[in-house]
């Protein structure tokens, strides 16, 4: 009942024009055309680019800028190629790619394990200048010094001191330079840095095909382009697959 007795609301600013008529009038009265705006924008950009070109020409004509450009060219000529392969080919101190983990070790690299150019857990650390022994002493070694040489199962890891079996029971690594079979020193698994699970048959480096320089370059570039997390996961999977008995 209260709603019926409410006074009627009358809006003073009402209009009888329909929406169609209103929008039609708005379209007719539209002032600037989009083409004109676009043309004016292009003209402003051309003016600005002409100013920039003049400024760049003035900068090039300055003697200080010319001297800096000449210095930059001579520096590039002095350094030669600056791509990643040229930088990787240069030695990094004593751990150069020709000294320990380099391309000039065909005998050891012929015996690359299934990991390609991967070694133990400290591959990347050693090549970038670290030493990173994981835990134990040097002879026991942990999974340590294996600089991308194909030394199987971690390089300098062994199980004993320098008294048992040459340099200890594999003090130069299982399948490293002294394998448990007829390797060079003591008892390791494999020949000379080879894959060998043959326990004395010496399946290793000398039976592998020789890798060319291009193949080694491609493997190394692919390895260096991977991220650290990807390499760590891949290396952990490889170590768990090949060395299940030494999970410490």
Swiss-Prot record:
Q: Where is the composition biased (Gly residues)?
A: 157-195
Which processes are annotated in GO (biological process)? chromatin remodeling; in utero embryonic development; mRNA export from nucleus
Instruction: Give me the ranges of the annotated region Interaction with PRMT1.
Output: 153-206
Motif (GAR motif) positions are: 194-203
Alphabetical list of SMART domains matching this protein:
FoP_duplication
User: What does the UniProt entry say about where the protein is found?
Assistant: Nucleus; Nucleus, Nucleolus; Nucleus, Nucleoplasm; Nucleus speckle
Name the record gives this protein: Chromatin target of PRMT1 protein
Taxonomic lineage: Eukaryota, Metazoa, Chordata, Craniata, Vertebrata
